[in-house]
Swiss-Prot record:
Disulfide pattern: C331-C358, C399-C433
Entry-linked Gene3D superfamilies: Invertase/pectin methylesterase inhibitor family protein, Single-stranded right-handed beta-helix, Pectin lyase-like
List of glycosylated residues: N179
Protein name: Pectinesterase 2.2
Positions marked as site (Transition state stabilizer): Q364
Organism of this sequence: Solanum lycopersicum (Tomato)
SMART domains referenced in this protein's UniProt entry, alphabetically: PMEI
């Protein structure tokens, strides 16, 4: 039998148990609430806080999901600013590309088809370049200046172009091959990186002054002399001559012997003659200048083409990727002819490159202005279909663009610009140029219509301004690529042109076509704005105008 105290003691023990249980429940509830705040509410607040970071993305939800992934992996925090998030995103992007390289290399080694092997070789080269470009972009963004922001936008635009080029090369092959390269993911990340960069503002530390079309006084005496001198008087580091009077007999040998990642200008002088070879200036060959005895005297010639098994990318007689490349007083040609379809004479993917007083001859796809910032001056470019194409930020000044007689039933297209995203800082600008017919086309103009361009990609962007347009230009001015593809998203413009082909009354009525009357609308396509020429062309010594004549 229980004593009188026992019920009281039992009741007290139960009360203590209840109190303990309530405390435990409260603590558990508190931890659950904290968990929800940290892992559910915080990311939501983070997403709201950084929604502006994705405001220009084509797929804003995908962009935000990438940002959320960075937070969930504790790579960034809710306090991280936009630039810090972008840099972490790019570091992760480099890892993804490095992971893709051995996969693509293994695919290439397992393939016996020469065309597929060639396409994968191109992809490997482009992936390797892209890793460097993204790494350079991270360093540029970290400096947080307007000029470095522009550099990063150019380089990241090039990365997206590289991925799309790889996709284009593989497009005719199996879907499994494309999936194996992880290209779709890499392209998505490149677009998101550009969108993030576009949303971040930086202080404007550049003051771009209008140029006067002459060499600036601040150019070093050596660089000015290089641009003004003839080849034989230039004081070259290496000389190429077919007759053995130079150190090298081929340009390819001289380029291979040039120093890697040079900090100063390295000059190769190529004596007059016809050199049958294909030459590549790799990304390691920086600040390289190749100069000849004149566009009619020193000729580099090749005939690689798509019909005979080459890729468009690797059909180039001369390809240049190394930053700061200069080509002067030389003819580059591809003699494959119109029946061989795509056959590139010159491909340029070198940032801050200059082509001065050169002749570039071929038929279809003559000049592949592939990517990065480029400037062409006093040069002569001939071709038929899409004879200036690619996705560089490129300005032509005082050049002659000459349409040739194409193959039967073909039409001439001066340009085919390949911008794939509105955040890419790319486009083709033709200023102070003459667009004319060759002597063999002139008698048969009615048989072979010539257009200023057609949209190769969705956001194609080309402006022709302050130029002479010959009577070869069809009154419509511009041609379709495939039905209504890109007609609403492209940007084609004409400003202050003259000549029999310059009338705009019968031009296309597409939403993306602009007959520009306000100089302010034309300014983004000048040397100063499109390629930021005021900050780098001055150091090359080439003559240029960085604004509009008016």
């Amino acid at each position: 039998m229980a004593t009188p105290q026992q019920p009281l003691l039992t009741k007290t023990h139960k009360q203590n148990s209840i109190i303990s249980f309530k405390i435990l429940t409260f603590v558990v509830t508190l931890f659950v609430a904290l968990f929800l705040v940290v892992f559910l509410v915080a990311p939501y607040q983070f997403e709201i806080k950084h929604s502006n970071l994705c405001k220009t993305a084509q797929d804003s939800q995908l962009c935000l999901s990438y940002v959320s992934d960075l937070m969930s992996n504790e790579i960034v925090t809710t306090d991280s600013d936009g630039l810090s998030i972008l840099m972490k995103f790019l570091v992760n992007y480099v890892h993804q590309m490095n992971n893709a390289i051995p996969v693509v290399s293994k695919m290439k080694n397992q393939i016996n088809d020469i065309r597929q092997e060639g396409a994968l070789t191109d992809c490997l080269e482009l992936l390797d370049q892209s890793v460097d470009l993204v790494s350079d972009s991270i360093a540029a963004i970290d400096k947080r200046t307007h000029s470095e922001h522009a550099n990063a936008q150019s380089w990241l635009s090039g990365v997206l172009t590289n991925h799309v080029t790889c996709l284009d090369e593989l497009d005719s092959f199996t879907k499994a091959m494309i999936n194996g390269t992880n290209l779709d993911e890499l392209i998505s990340r490149a677009k998101v990186a550009l969108a993030m960069l576009a949303s971040v503002t930086t202080p404007n530390d550049d003051v771009l002054r209008p140029g006067l079309g002459k060499m600036p006084s601040w150019v070093s005496s050596r660089d000015r002399k290089l641009m003004e001198s003839s080849g034989k008087d230039i004081g070259a580091n290496a000389v190429v001559a077919k007759d053995g009077t130079g150190k090298y007999r081929t340009l390819a040998e001289a380029v291979a012997a040039a120093p890697d990642k040079s900090k100063t200008r390295y000059v190769i002088y190529v004596k007059r003659g016809i050199y049958k070879e294909n030459v590549e200036v790799s990304s390691r060959k920086m600040k390289l200048m190749i100069v000849g005895d004149g566009m009619h005297a020193t000729i580099i010639t090749g005939n690689l083409n798509v019909v005979d098994g080459s890729t468009t990318f690797h059909s180039a007689t001369l390809a240049a990727v190394g930053k700061g490349f200069i080509l002067q007083d030389i003819c580059i040609q591809n003699t494959a002819g119109p029946a061989k379809h795509q056959a590139v004479a010159l491909r340029v993917g070198a940032d801050k490159s200059v082509i001065n007083r050169c002749r570039i001859d071929a038929y279809q796809d003559t000049l592949y202005a592939h990517s990065q910032r480029q400037f062409y001056r006093d040069s002569y470019v001939t071709g038929t279909i899409d004879f200036i194409f690619g996705n560089a930020a490129v300005v032509f000044q005082k050049c002659k663009l000459v349409a040739r007689k194409p193959g039967k039933y073909q039409q001439n297209m001066v340009t085919a610009q390949g911008r794939t995203d509105p955040n890419q800082a790319t486009g083709t600008s033709i200023q102070f140029c003459n667009i004319i017919a060759s002597s063999d086309l002139e008698p048969v103009l009615k048989e072979f219509p010539t257009y200023l361009g057609r949209p190769w990609k969705k956001y194609s962007r080309t402006v022709v301004m302050e130029s002479y347009l010959g009577g070869l230009i069809n009154p419509a001015g511009w041609a379709e690529w495939d039905g209504d593809f890109a007609l609403k998203t492209l940007y084609y413009g004409e400003f202050m042109n003259n000549g029999p082909g310059a009338g705009t009354s019968k031009r296309v009525k597409w939403p993306g076509y602009h007959c520009i009357t306000d100089p302010a609308e034309a300014m983004p396509f000048t040397v100063a704005k499109l390629i930021q020429g005021g900050s780098w062309l001055r150091s090359t010594g080439v003559a240029y105008v960085d604004g509009l004549y008016d």
